[in-house]
């Protein structure tokens, strides 16, 4: 079986690492695996190739801003990708995140449809079934056509062309041989969202959870010394992972509020440090951490990991934390509560800080078998489990008539 994965990036950022992990896992299992990617440094590896240029991507970013159509244009890069597809001649093309000013998604879907190539489309975000936005939040306009988009300004669109973009995306998906297309989602919640679009619900939609690096993310046996090295005592420790602090969309203001309410609890924040006017003494900013062993140590020495995002389709911190034997509390954000281990997690309505504080206090008061938690999580979130899930989808497509 010959598989071609297509993604924005390779072996960097979340989806790039997922694609690289799958590529290595497939190769180890004797599957003929290829990757085509668009952005980032050129990678010199067998069967891995880049199809776009950084300058061209920036040009198309301007085009997207001027037209309000995010996933069109990209004529040259898309034609180069078609050439790679013809040369590889895959049994299955697996599309991941292809929304970074790099490929004309409408052309690509129509090309695969016309050529009768078996196709797997993985939704890592919502833009394929909404037509434009990665997170629709409370908006349901995408159910029947979009337009008058409440996020047009935040997406930096000069014109609100979301209705046209929605029609183009739905037309690209319409007419696929149902035995040749399978949509996968990274969480059960995202599947529920996708099935609300009638253009998607006619196809097979299968959740396949993201896999993480369980070789590094596992429970570490800690001592008081581990905490003392980063200035912590024996007080309860709450872990919070973010790309940047402060970051309103990631809910960092909720962390500030909880820290004020719970001065007896230490909050460990991993993420790039920004400018903060006032920081409670019990918030410890450790900056961005790239080393996975060190990340696993921080998860393991914490008593609980907290999630305060408004929307997440999966949430790597939830999976990583549980693999390290640390329970999770947070706001309901869609994906996290649908992929978690319920026994060790508690989620409350978004923005309800009182309930979040109660949930946090409750989890801190519980005694968990953290070794058992870690073993269950590793079994659920391993790269092997992810690869098994996708291979089952591939086999189903190969067997379909």
Residue ranges and their predicted role:
Residues 271-296:
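Nucleotide-activated donor-binding/catalytic signature segment of Leloir-type glycosyltransferases, i.e.
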Residues 342-353, 362-367:
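Conserved acidic donor-binding segment of nucleotide-sugar-dependent glycosyltransferases
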Residues 327-330:
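Short hydrophobic beta-strand element within catalytic cores of glycosyltransferases
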Residues 184, 232-250, 256-259:
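Conserved donor-binding/catalytic core segment of Leloir-type glycosyltransferases
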Residues 297-302:
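Short alpha-helical donor nucleotide-sugar binding micro-motif in glycosyltransferases
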Residues 195, 212-229, 277-280, 399:
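Acidic anion/phosphate-binding donor-loop and adjacent secondary structure
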Residues 367-398:
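A charged, aromatic-enriched C-terminal amphipathic alpha-helix characteristic of glycosyltransferases
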Residues 310:
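Aromatic "clamp/platform" in nucleotide-sugar-dependent glycosyltransferases that forms part
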